Regions:
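Walker A/P-loop
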Residues: 35-55
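Conserved helix-turn-beta segment of the N-terminal RecA-like "Helicase ATP-binding" lobe
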Residues: 75-99, 193
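Conserved helicase ATPase motor motifs in RecA-like P-loop NTPase domains
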Residues: 164-178
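Inter-Walker segment of RecA-like/P-loop motor cores
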Residues: 89-120
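Walker A/P-loop NTP-binding motif
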Residues: 30-31, 49-63
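Conserved Walker A/P-loop ATP-binding site and its immediately adjacent core
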Residues: 64-85, 179
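Inter-lobe coupling linker of SF2 helicases/translocases
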Residues: 110, 114-131, 148-165, 188-249
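Charged, low-complexity
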Residues: 1-38, 111-113, 118-119, 133
Length: 249
């Protein structure tokens, strides 16, 4: 497989040893060239940041370097640090003071990955409307409410990724309360994947009792990859916690 060979070479110099499920997830994102986006939805603690880092590394090596990471503000510095320490990729954090210079048409944007917060993306949406090679959205469950039409941040991110070659959403909880949340996430990067909200509801929400659950699972599996902790415990040593009851004396 061409992508497997390329990744092996790319990761030779990386300061990280990806686990098999992380490589699988990265390959899933890279081997879907006709999809505008994917969701990497591994459970908490399985290294979705590493998976995205591998994808970014591949794009970087191909000199497709117009890359944007949208993340909670508290994680911006961590992303910058991990990209450089683990993958030797430089990144810079966008803020209101630097945005005009960094996003100016003549600026050599390809010298570093750009990182911004969700708040920044919402406030400065117009400045971020461009032909990105890759957009990564971390903690993307923040975008699940896109289906309601009331999520301003989700709407802004959807507009931003509209011009991207590929979008990668990272979230451990793609679904929490309503099936429509799945529709909301996928529609961030592909508004027509489920045709329309009405069509989705008719087929999958109302039709769940008619046995359409398998069909929905198949449709979602085409755009989403999820590994559970129990599937990864053979090569990740999780801390085992045992509750102990101690009597007060």
């Amino acid at each position: 497989n061409d992508h497997v060979g390329k990744l092996a070479g790319l990761l030779f110099d990386a300061q990280v040893e990806p686990k098999p499920h992380q490589i699988d997830a990265a390959l899933f994102a890279l081997q879907t060239p006709f999809l505008p986006g994917v969701i990497l939805a591994d459970e908490v603690g399985l290294g979705k940041t590493i998976e995205a880092g591998i994808v970014i590394t591949q794009y970087w090596a191909e000199r497709k370097r117009n890359i944007l990471i949208v993340t909670p503000s508290s994680l911006r510095q961590q992303w910058k640090q991990e990209l450089y320490e683990k993958f030797l990729i430089p990144a810079i954090i966008l803020d209101p003071k630097s945005k005009d210079a960094l996003l100016a048409p003549g600026h050599g944007r390809q010298s570093e990955v750009l990182i911004c917060s969700y708040e920044f993306a919402q406030r400065h949406e117009q400045s971020l409307l461009r032909g990105w090679d890759l957009v990564v959205a971390d903690e993307a469950h923040r975008l699940r409410n896109h289906w309601t039409g009331k999520g301003k941040t989700a709407e802004a991110v959807s507009h931003i990724v509209g011009g991207a070659h590929k979008t990668v959403l990272l979230t451990a909880t793609p679904l929490q309360n309503k099936l429509e949340e799945l529709y909301g996430l996928v529609s961030v990067f592909d508004p027509s994947y489920f045709y329309s909200l009405d069509a989705f509801r008719e087929r999958y929400v109302k039709g769940l009792d008619l046995g359409n659950g398998d069909d929905l699972a198949e449709r979602v599996a085409s755009v989403a990859k999820r590994t559970l902790r129990r599937d990864a415990d053979k090569y990740i040593h999780f801390t085992k916690r045992m509750p102990l009851t101690v009597e007060f004396t």
